[in-house]
UniProtKB/Swiss-Prot annotation:
This is Anaerobic nitric oxide reductase transcription regulator NorR. One of its GO terms (biological process) is phosphorelay signal transduction system. Residues 486-505 bind DNA. PANTHER family: ANAEROBIC NITRIC OXIDE REDUCTASE TRANSCRIPTION REGULATOR NORR (PTHR32071:SF35), TRANSCRIPTIONAL REGULATORY PROTEIN (PTHR32071). PROSITE patterns: SIGMA54_INTERACT_1, SIGMA54_INTERACT_2, SIGMA54_INTERACT_3, SIGMA54_INTERACT_4. SUPFAM superfamilies: GAF domain-like, Homeodomain-like, P-loop containing nucleoside triphosphate hydrolases. Pathway: Nitrogen metabolism; nitric oxide reduction. NCBIfam families: PRK05022.1. Residues 188-417 form the Sigma-54 factor interaction domain. GO terms for molecular function: ATP binding; ATP hydrolysis activity; DNA binding; DNA-binding transcription factor activity. ATP binds at residues 216-223, 279-288. It holds the Pfam family Sigma54_activat. The keyword Transcription applies.
Length: 510
């Protein structure tokens, strides 16, 4: 038996000791670094045709937030398809997913050593380990037998960790794979304490029938939380129906919620199911529920109390089995005190309240999220790599993010577009000059348009143009004072939310 395998047998006991899952993964990669003398390595989970980093060594922290599509990364696709050890020629022209992301090497990886170890359980791919060295001859003496041993050991460790997670968080669920419940489509990025607590709470409530009230500032990801609750529940195979209460005109609100029959009102040319019926057997997500009128709140309360609805114009009652997840950026118990929200409805909705922390309280998650969005925009722009400069990483951590995760997403995407325009290269680095995050204004705010709207209205324009210019100026000022919150802006301007959205589109604000 080779000395390398002997070394691995020696540390197997440490890997299987009572460490946390993350500590086991980190120990695995540290051992790979020490034994193979590599510059970087990563342990990846395979989900939804993507590789998700679980642990890294020698790579920038932002890598943990990235999700690598095998369709867009030929090296990772080769590892996923091979079924055995993959050694890439040192002069391979295939782009490396870690270009610019190895901590002790700046820029594109040219000639270097690269090995991929697929992690298989019963011939099914569950993950991979990637190993890179800047020395093109670093791994020449390694035998495939030795690498297969490492791969088998890592596959067993990863499989055990996934089974333990399934037992801990999904014990009451049916037998389908936990990976089917928790996929990239509803993944919540973040390792901060606040987000770990939130994930635990989602797992606890997902498979119950309790109504959930998701609370948090604009842009924190409340819809993503609702999505996760639905997809981790027994209702995942049925519909998740979305309704933005803030953009719901009062005139059609009842029909949108409960449906109508033919002839119920002018324009009702056929029967139509409302959101409650569309979500029957599934979940209805009521976003910005705090914007509902008191009259509509009373009708919603009745549906929740009795589990049936009436279509507009119909005398019949229709039973529905619909779970409610609601979200708001208002402090609803304060709204109850102010008489703007019904106390009985508040208690019905908030059986299980969840709070999504703002990004300023999640400093350690900022770079993970930045990496996630950088990988997204890389694929959309057709680039080989998008990386964050060290100085930019420091700036992102220090900024207070009034627009939360949504602001970060917009900032990264806008910066990538600017960086691409700055250079013809397919490998770009985002630098401080690509970002405009010096002021507390959210990127949701159309600042250029706001600046233009500040100019005095000229006397030589027509009444309609002058009226439009004044309305635009007023809306932009209200948006800025409310940090981009459209619902709060509608309240300040004393407008119906739906009418405000339509007016904003006509004026070119949205």
């Amino acid at each position: 038996m080779t000395s390398l395998i002997a070394q691995w047998l020696h540390i197997t006991q440490d890997l299987n000791s009572a460490l946390t899952r993350q500590a086991r993964f980190d120990t695995l990669l540290t051992t790979i670094r020490d034994v193979l003398n590599c510059d970087s390595s990563a342990l990846l989970l395979f989900e939804d045709q993507h590789f998700k980093p679980l642990a890294i060594n020698g790579l920038a922290k932002e890598v943990l937030g990235r999700r690598f599509s095998i369709e867009q990364h030929p090296r990772l696709e080769a590892i996923a398809r091979a079924g055995d050890i993959v050694r890439f020629p040192s002069e391979s022209t295939l782009p490396d997913p870690y270009d610019g992301l190895i901590t002790n090497h700046q820029g594109k990886l040219h000639v270097h050593s690269c090995i991929g170890l697929p992690l298989l359980i019963d011939d099914q791919l569950i993950g991979a380990i990637t190993i890179d060295a800047l020395d093109p001859n670093q791994f020449d003496q390694l035998k495939n037998q030795e690498l297969r041993f490492i791969s088998a050991l890592a596959a067993g460790g990863l499989h055990t960790a996934l089974l333990l997670e399934q037992l801990e968080t999904q014990a009451s669920l049916p037998r389908e794979s936990y990976a089917e419940k928790r996929t990239l489509s509803n993944e919540i990025i973040g390792n901060s304490q606040g987000m770990r607590t939130l994930q635990d709470q989602i797992d606890a409530v997902a498979n119950t029938e309790l109504s959930v009230l998701v609370m948090g500032e604009t842009g924190v990801g409340k819809e993503l939380v609702a999505n996760a609750i639905h997809h981790r529940s027994d209702r995942a195979s049925n519909n998740l129906v979305y309704l933005n209460c803030a953009a719901l005109p009062e005139s059609v609100a009842e029909s949108e919620l409960f449906g109508h029959i033919k002839g119920a009102f002018t324009g009702a040319i056929s029967h139509r199911k409302g959101k409650f019926e569309q979500a029957d057997g599934g979940t209805l997500f009521l976003d910005e529920v705090g914007e509902l009128s008191l009259e509509l709140q009373a009708k919603l309360l009745r549906a929740l109390q009795y589990g049936d609805i009436q279509r507009v114009g119909d005398d019949r009652h229709i039973r529905v089995n619909t779970r409610i997840v609601a979200a708001t950026n208002r402090v609803l118990h304060e709204e109850v005190k102010a008489g703007r929200f019904r106390a009985d409805l508040y208690h019905r909705l908030s059986v299980f309240p969840l709070h999504v922390p703002p990004l300023r309280e999640r400093e350690e998650d900022v770079i993970l999220l930045a990496g996630f969005f950088a990988e997204q925009v890389r694929g959309k722009l057709g680039l080989h790599s998008v990386r964050l400069s060290p100085s930019l990483v420091a700036e992102l951590r220090e900024y207070h993010w009034p627009g939360n995760v949504r602001e970060l997403e917009h900032v990264i995407k806008r910066a990538a577009v600017l960086a691409k325009a700055r250079t013809p290269q397919m490998d770009i680095e985002l630098i401080s000059q690509d970002f405009d995050i010096k002021t507390p204004t959210s990127p949701m705010m159309p600042t250029v348009a706001a600046s233009q709207a500040q100019h005095e209205i000229h006397s030589d324009i027509g009444l309609k143009q002058a009226t439009d210019a004044f309305q635009k100026k007023l809306i932009l000022r209200a948006l800025e004072s409310n940090q981009g919150n459209w619902a709060a802006t509608a309240r300040q301007l004393e407008l119906d939310s739906g009418n405000l959205h339509r007016l904003a589109k006509r004026l070119g604000i949205k």
